[in-house]
Structures are given as structure tokens and as C-alpha cells.
Amino acid sequence: MDFHAISQRFIDMMRSKNSQNASQPPETYPFYHEVRQMSQHPWMYEDPELQDYALSILPLDKLFQDASELEKEGDGSWGYQDYVIQALLKWFKREFFVWVNQPPCEKCGGETHMTGNGPPNEEEKWNGVRNVELYQCNVCGHNQRFPRYNRIRALLDSRKGRCGEWANCFTFLCRALGSRARWIWNAEDHVWTEVYSNKQQRWVHVDSGEESFDEPLIYEQGWGKKMSYCLGFGIDSVRDVSHRYIRHPENGLPRDRCPESVLQQALHEINIEFRSRLTDSERKALEEEDKREKDELDGYMRPVSQATPTNTDLPARQTGNVEWKEKRGEAGK
């Protein structure tokens, strides 16, 4: 069977899944409840006091100046707010947040190794910590904790972590700067951001850990990552955006957590609930946006040779050590 036939078979399979009906009520599927729970995540970004605190930290003059320079150098395809996000992305990656493989010893600065995991203490629980990694210094033997923070205020102060902390804090900062933003969850243990471009009238991929802007194929073509679900969560728009990131049949993993109709029903219900507080004109504008995005995502369902050429210039993953990336299937092809 040639590659075109394989591609068409994959498309037919996905269309068949999309038309699949659930034989049980949606509430009987754990994934239905998981999706609804994840939809609450972006609401933590809407705290006005927290946004004010973020604005007091951000180098606004520098970001706006850098955005103006990018706009002058650009070809007009992006708007000023898009350039603000690009400036934020550069600053966040290079100056603000720190990637942690193993934390250095807090006592002597030596290298450490992981000894296990432990429960969070009361203060850590309050800061959204569910897991604490335990490390021991290779030099002085000092034992220390590395709590995986989820609460935004704690992240703004600690300024370190891995992809979860990076995406969480960066997505929040996009909201603090006035952009519409989505927190993107991938079932294969990665998260990133999408920001809506008013200029281009579409949602744009942004990965703060990789300093990647509008490169949605970086995962499957750069990292060599295989994926199943990619779901986008915002305060006025939730959507299955998997087709934006999974374009080639060999990179698609089984979508078997629930029937497709159950997932679509969950997303539909969430959108209705989130938009119920909006005006009629605001809801109508979002419905038009939904149609444009559906057309975009459906376009990626065409045979690969027509829809998505392979880009061999996309980089392999930058963050994380080699062993960690290989274990996650993200070390590149």
C-alpha cells in the first residue's frame, strides 16, 4: 500500500470515529469528566489582582518597544499585539523562567539526583502542588524538595519548572497583557499555549519552553512526537485542536478514551456554559470564529500530499536532558 493510500485510510478512520455514537451516557466515561475538569484551568488566569501583580513584574517598556521594532521590520501579516506576544516569548524564555532538569543543591550549589517523590506540605497544597520531587546533593548529601507548583502566584515568584509550569505561567502572562489565550493539553504529557491573532483571525501556536511561535508541526516533525489528543481550553473557547498538530497518519496514536461523540458533546456543553454570560453579539462573533476554525482544522484532513508538506527544518526539542527526551519520545527523528 503506497503512502497516499495509507494517508487516506487514516483520514477515513478519523472520519469514522467522528461519526461514532456513544452507546452509554457521556457521564459514564471518565474522560468526559476529565475534560470538564480541565476546562476550569484557564479561569485561574482571570484574577484581576494577580494580573496587576504580573504587570508590575513585566518589563512593559521593553516589551512594547521590542514589539514596535518587530512591527516596523515585519511585512504587515501580523498585528501589534502579535508582536507583543513574540517579545514576551523571547523575554520569558531567555530572561524570566528557568528550566529545571535536576535542581542544583540549595546548600552548596552542587549537582543533585532524584531519590523519589513525597507528599506536599500544607503550604505547598495551598499553592496547587500535587507532587513533590525529592533530591539529594551528590557533593554534600543535602536533601531537598522540588515542589511542582500549579498556582500562578507561586510560579511568578519561583520562576522555574518544566513544561507544565512554563505553559501555565506563560499563558497567564498572555492574558495579563490582554490577549485571548488557550491552555493546550496534550494527552502524551505536554502542554503549551495558543493565542488568538486578531490580525490573522486565527489561533496561533506558542510554546514558551521552545521559544516557538506559529510552528504547530514542531512536535510531530521536529520532536518526532506521536500524539492522540490535543485540547484547547480558554474562557470563551474550548476545542479539540488535534488536527492542527497531528497531520501525518504515522504520528497519530489511538483516540480511545471515549467515543468521539462524547468528547464533542463535552466540549459543546462547556462552550455553551462559558458563553452564557456573554451578549448576543459576542456569542455570534464567537460562533463565526468557530466556523472559521472548523474549516481550518477540517482542511488538515485532506490527503497529506495536498494539506501538509513535511518541514525538515523544524528543530528537535531544546528543553530537557537527552535521557528525559528519549523516554518521552521527543528526541527528534
Swiss-Prot record:
Residues 281-299, 323-333 have a biased composition (Basic and acidic residues). Pfam families: Transglut_core. GO terms for biological process: ERAD pathway; protein quality control for misfolded or incompletely synthesized proteins. Residues 281-333 are annotated as: Disordered. The keyword Cell division does not apply. It is found in: Cytoplasm; Nucleus. This is Peptide-N(4)-(N-acetyl-beta-glucosaminyl)asparagine amidase. The gene is png1.
